From Swiss-Prot:
Protein name listed in UniProt: tRNA uridine 5-carboxymethylaminomethyl modification enzyme MnmG
Job of this protein: NAD-binding protein involved in the addition of a carboxymethylaminomethyl (cmnm) group at the wobble position (U34) of certain tRNAs, forming tRNA-cmnm(5)s(2)U34.
Gene Ontology terms: cellular component: cytosol
Signal peptide limits: none
Cofactors, names only: FAD
Length: 622
């Protein structure tokens, strides 16, 4: 009988990261997915990254994950979103060639040390004494294991809706999984339904681009991965069009036929990625909504019209599309649809992503209530790392709100749960100025090195980068000019007769890297590796970062203050019954987690801290 230490079920974005991370830690790992072409499948939009999401990708890369490197082998339209705003909200994004992305992912995974791939369907999991024993395939065969990572995406009792038509499926033309849903219910997990959707696909050869707006990418693509020196994939343009009043009229007239508005769908959809029906109803005063026409590949004429996700009947979809400028004669290749699926309340998992009910069972991705490739991949890498570390009897690996967006996401999910598809935003992070895309490796790679999940190649690149940062920082502190000379160059500084270094100049409003290079041409040599830009940001926002680091230190001290599992909140007399009930229900593990529970007052936190000092001052009962 086959036996593996870790088995990952599902080969989507969470699954591939989980399997690769486990394998990198030297643990024999099996990835089970339905077919080869499912590996890294982009079920919805053909793009990676975006605002906050791009930072997640960079963090995955910092831990030697796959997503950043793979998109650099397949990215056909790179764009830094929000670049006119502050660096805390910059969002690296790349349009992908679907075929190139899957090809690169397949080539990497099929040659990955310690990783085997099995193409098949898991029907059930075997548990004994609340511990994982094996997976059972639909052909009845059994594979023994110590740990299982479930990354089921939209396959748990998946149901596609197109108008009034219902199609049981986890994805178009792929069967859903009822067996695993039933098993999870039998175990006692709390399951609910969520919904997501996708737009129709259209034929780019039938679009009149003269009626659309050109959207070029960045002149020089900035890679996601620290392993990528330069993006060698050909770059192409995207285009923008918009809905019209006629589009809106057709949608309003047919709302009763929409699966969402007819009451046919039970699941809640993503608040921040609404269907076109939702947009028309919720934003009824808007006369138009933008649509991004995104090519699905270099040699693929399929276009993804980002912005018109729908569950309307096919004939209505055809009508509304033809009211959009440039799409009057367009050919629809595949209808849009909504898909409903089961997920588990993420408060049933710990911050390691191991379930609280079953030892050795981990969840990652949409099963935890998230939406998005990047959110799934971020969970996958953490689940894979922790499953492998548990096999090796090593301490778990936990990221926090203070050091990563991945940590913010996991803390949000495990503390508050979610009743709608969870998506990452910069606004979810209290420390977003410190948690930028450009410093992801400086925050996380050393942590990955400490547990052995980072390859030797990446270690060398990271070590060299750290050395270069110190060298360039020293240079920036050495190069200087007097205030009088700077004034003659038109740079406004206080005329105090002192010398100003480049780092001093970076703090001046409106002074930028390009100006520094003009004044000190030798800096041009440092520009290629983005270190100069990094140091510019650190200098520009130094005072804010100093204050934020103080906040982070306070946060970390509260996170380190554990709350005993057996604490009885009803014995703390100075807090209200409502708060006592809330704390008893949530069972926070630290003071930091307790503080983040909605409705918990600062006075209640103070009361808990005082109670812990008096009741548990001898260190008993943790």
């Amino acid at each position: 009988m086959l036996k593996y230490d870790v088995i990952v079920i599902g080969g989507g974005h969470a699954g591939v990261e989980a399997a690769a991370a486990s394998a990198r830690l030297g643990v024999p790992t099996l990835l089970i997915t339905l077919k080869p072409e499912n590996l890294g499948e982009m079920s919805c939009n053909p793009a990676i990254g975006g605002i906050a999401k791009g930072t997640l990708v960079k963090e995955i890369d910092a831990l030697d994950g796959l997503m950043g490197y793979v998109i650099d082998q397949a990215g056909i339209h790179y764009k830094m979103l929000n670049e006119t705003r502050g660096p805390a909200v910059w969002g690296p994004r790349a349009q992908a060639d679907r075929k190139l992305y899957k090809k690169a992912m397949y080539q990497i995974l099929t040659n990955y040390p310690n990783l085997d791939i099995l193409y098949g369907k898991v029907e059930d999991i075997e548990i004994k004494s609340s511990k994982i024993e094996a997976v059972i395939l639909n052909n009845g065969s059994k594979i023994l294991c110590q740990k299982i990572i479930l990354t089921t995406g939209t396959f748990l009792s998946g149901l596609i809706h197109i108008g009034q038509k219902k199609i049981p499926a986890g994805r178009v033309d792929e069967e859903p999984s009822y067996g695993l849903s039933n098993t999870l219910k039998q175990i006692g997990f709390k399951l609910a339904r969520l919904k997501t959707g996708t737009p129709p696909r259209i034929d780019g050869r039938t679009i009149d681009y003269s009626k659309t707006i050109l959207q070029p990418g960045d002149k020089i693509p900035r890679p996601f991965s620290e392993l990528t020196n330069i993006v060698n994939v050909s770059q192409i343009n995207c285009f923008i069009t918009k809905t019209t009043s006629e589009t809106h009229d057709i949608i309003r007239e047919n709302l009763d036929k929409s699966a969402m508005y007819s009451g046919q769908i039970e699941g809640i959809g993503p608040r921040y990625c609404p269907s076109i029906e939702d947009k028309i109803v919720r934003f009824s005063t808007k006369s138009e909504h933008r649509i991004f026409l995104e090519p699905e590949g270099l040699d693929d004429y399929t276009i993804y019209p980002n912005g018109i996700s729908t569950s309307l009947p096919e004939d209505v979809q055809h009508k509304l599309i033809k009211t959009i400028p440039g799409l009057e004669n367009v050919k629809v290749l595949r209808p849009g649809y909504a898909i409903e699926y089961d997920y588990v309340d993420p408060r049933e998992i710990s911050v390691t992503l191991e379930t609280k009910k079953i030892a050795g069972l981990y969840f990652a991705g949409q099963i935890n209530g998230t939406t998005g490739y990047e959110e799934a991949a971020g969970q996958g890498i953490i689940a894979g790392i922790n499953a492998a570390l548990a096999v090796k009897d090593q301490a778990p690996f936990m990221l926090t709100r203070a050091n990563s967006y991945i940590g913010v996401m996991i803390d949000d999910l495990t503390t508050f749960g979610t009743i709608e598809p969870y998506r990452m935003f910069t606004s979810r992070s209290e420390y977003r100025l410190s948690l930028r895309a450009d410093n992801s490796d400086l925050r996380l790679t050393e942590l990955g090195m400490n547990i052995g999940v980072v390859s030797e190649k990446r270690k060398k690149i990271f070590t060299k980068k750290c050395e270069d940062i110190e060298k360039i920082k020293s240079l920036l502190n050495t190069l200087s000019l007097t205030t009088s000379k700077l004034a003659k160059m038109g740079i406004q500084v206080a005329q105090d007769g002192t010398y100003k270094t480049v780092l001093d100049l970076f703090k001046i409003p409106n002074f930028n890297v390009e100006q520094a290079i003009k004044i000190f041409p030798m800096l041009k040599e440092t520009q290629n590796n983005n270190i100069l830009q990094l140091l510019y940001i650190e200098a520009k926002y130094a005072s804010y970062l100093t204050r934020q680091h103080a906040d982070i230190n306070l946060f970390q001290s509260e996170e380190a203050q554990l709350i005993p599992k057996n604490i009885d909140y009803f014995k703390i007399p100075s807090i209200s019954l409502e708060i006592q009930e809330k704390l008893s229900s949530h069972k926070p593990t630290t003071i930091g987690v307790a503080r983040r529970i909605p409705g918990i007052t600062p006075a209640a936190i103070t009361a808990i801290i005082i109670y812990l000092k008096t009741k548990y001052s001898d260190g008993s009962s943790t």
